[in-house]
């Protein structure tokens, strides 16, 4: 009996430690469905309901634009897939993008079409405590889907010292993320290698998980792209070749190597930054692999000249783990710190979601009105703004004649190449006079940023254009982007529009 009692006494601390581990994982990953958490019964369903309600509100309160890809690489492509009109950018002509992601939205469009419910309001795909997550997560960017799949994958990732992970599930989610956006592989390289290193049955991991998952997802992606491209295209390889190996993304701008460390990561973390640093110092060693994944990802992206905030968005969930661990360690200051984070993120979230850069979307409602009368067949729109500044047919949903300034990169290596948008902005007045040498070529409506108005005012007056709408865009105009967007229409057409 004494021996049995001794064994029982030694087993209790182990069970207590196991319970603590389960609770930590529950806090870290949210314990979906309450299946894997260590909290009270009903806690996870309530948390899930709260999260769904929050994202529903998030969706309603994001009414601004972020970057062109949220429309041009998803909704515009899907619109063309279903309704047979829409614009495909140069990436699609060169096989750098795959149809797997737009197919999600195309399926929704097709259902609406079959139900005869494809009016423009329904075709505005709903863009469902971190301000950057609030700003980005509900957008139709591939980066947002990449981040979402990363979060789900992390919930199944096998942490050292725990047997609660699922190799097949997390590897499947990673594979799906890579199909949608090939750069999703970057943050997972150290995590997968860490898993492989600690895995005792390495051969089983490769033969029973890695190879089957890779073959199924890659095969499905190939078939989907074969159907829509009409030929075999390995878009993931083309994407990596263009953006990583050839580094041709510099055509769209470049930043210094340290930009992600000095601006990118601090901006997307915001007021979470000090908590992130504190959490990195306090977190146990077994969680350092997540910090390594963050550092590795930022370093890799730092080697590429073209940089954007959204590129490192997928590491934000990893950073938030350390922020949460920091709050846990603060104990007496926990509630005050949480209140500070909530209040300090509320203002930038609401401002960027409701006000900043909303003109790009609002102006399309003016364009869409041209579809609602008999004037449609005579109407035409020319968007004289930096290329892809607004959505296109996905937000108009009628075959209206529309045109915009284009800026595809030159893939032939011609160093003297200048795209149409740069040619226009080098001398807008001369470009317009040369392009529209005959009045019959003039569009019925012109759309441009307010900063351009004075420079082309003589052309507008000479050709008989009059301002018909002024749309607010941003409080911080920069370069070619103005504070407002103007809509001009020809005076002779005013009785029809």
Model-derived segments and their meaning:
Residues 1-57, 209-216:
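Start-transfer (signal-anchor) and selected internal transmembrane alpha helices
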Residues 48-52, 214, 219, 275, ...:
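Signature aromatic-anchored transmembrane alpha helix within multi-pass, membrane-resident enzymes
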Residues 56-60, 131-137, 151-182, 192, ...:
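Membrane-interface alpha helices of multi-pass inner-membrane proteins
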Residues 67, 94-97, 135-145, 308-309:
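Short acidic/glycine- and proline-prone juxtamembrane loop motifs at membrane-interface regions
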Residues 73-82, 92-117, 144, 261-265, ...:
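Short hydrophobic/aromatic helix or loop-helix immediately within or flanking a transmembrane segment
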Residues 155-174, 183-218, 277, 281, ...:
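Perimembrane helix-loop-helix junctions
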Residues 262-286, 298, 320:
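Hydrophobic, aromatic-rich transmembrane alpha-helices
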Residues 333-450, 480, 492:
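Membrane-embedded, lumen/periplasm-facing catalytic core of multi-pass transferases
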């Amino acid at each position: 009996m004494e021996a049995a009692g001794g064994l029982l006494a030694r087993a209790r601390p182990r069970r207590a430690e196991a319970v603590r581990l389960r609770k930590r994982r529950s806090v870290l990953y949210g314990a979906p469905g309450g299946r894997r958490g260590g909290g009270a019964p009903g806690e996870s369903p309530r948390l899930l309901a709260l999260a769904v309600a929050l994202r529903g509100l998030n969706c309603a309160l994001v009414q601004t634009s972020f970057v062109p890809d949220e429309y041009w690489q998803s909704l515009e492509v899907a619109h063309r897939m279903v309704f047979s009109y829409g614009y495909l950018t140069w990436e699609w002509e060169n096989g750098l993008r795959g149809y797997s992601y737009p197919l999600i939205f195309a399926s929704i469009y097709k259902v609406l079409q079959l139900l005869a419910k494809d009016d423009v309001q329904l075709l505005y795909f709903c863009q469902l405590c971190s301000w950057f997550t609030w700003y980005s997560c509900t957008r139709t960017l591939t980066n947002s889907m990449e981040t979402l799949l990363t979060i789900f994958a992390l919930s199944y990732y096998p942490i050292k010292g725990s047997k609660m992970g699922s190799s097949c599930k997390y590897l499947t989610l990673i594979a799906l993320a890579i199909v949608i956006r090939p750069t999703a592989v970057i943050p997972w390289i150290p995590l997968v290698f860490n898993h492989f290193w600690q895995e005792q049955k390495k051969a089983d991991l490769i033969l029973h998980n890695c190879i089957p998952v890779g073959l199924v997802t890659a095969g499905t992606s190939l078939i989907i792209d074969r159907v829509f491209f009409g030929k075999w295209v390995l878009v993931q390889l083309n994407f990596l070749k263009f953006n990583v190996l050839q580094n041709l993304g510099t055509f769209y701008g470049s930043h210094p190597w340290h930009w992600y460390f000095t601006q990118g990561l601090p901006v997307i973390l915001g007021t979470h930054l000090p908590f992130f640093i504190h959490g990195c110092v306090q977190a146990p060693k077994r969680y350092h692999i997540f910090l390594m994944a963050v550092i590795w990802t930022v370093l890799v992206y730092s080697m590429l000249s073209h940089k954007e905030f959204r590129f490192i968005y997928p590491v934000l969930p990893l950073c938030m783990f350390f922020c949460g661990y920091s709050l846990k360690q603060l104990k007496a200051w926990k509630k005050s710190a949480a209140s500070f984070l909530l209040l300090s993120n509320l203002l930038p979230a609401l401002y960027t979601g409701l006000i900043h850069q909303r003109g790009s979307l609002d102006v399309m409602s003016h364009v869409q009105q041209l579809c609602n009368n008999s004037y449609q067949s005579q109407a035409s729109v020319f968007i004289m703004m930096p290329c892809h500044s607004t959505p296109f047919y996905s937000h108009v949903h009628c075959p209206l004649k529309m045109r915009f300034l284009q800026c595809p990169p030159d893939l032939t290596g011609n160093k003297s190449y200048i795209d149409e948008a740069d040619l226009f902005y080098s001398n807008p007045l001369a470009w317009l006079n040369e392009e529209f040498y005959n009045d019959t070529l003039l569009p019925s409506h012109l759309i441009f940023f307010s900063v351009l108005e004075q420079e082309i005012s003589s052309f507008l007056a000479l050709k008989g254009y009059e301002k018909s709408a002024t749309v607010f865009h941003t409080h911080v105009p920069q370069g070619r982007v103005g504070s407002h967007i103007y809509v001009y229409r020809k005076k002779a057409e005013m009785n029809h529009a």
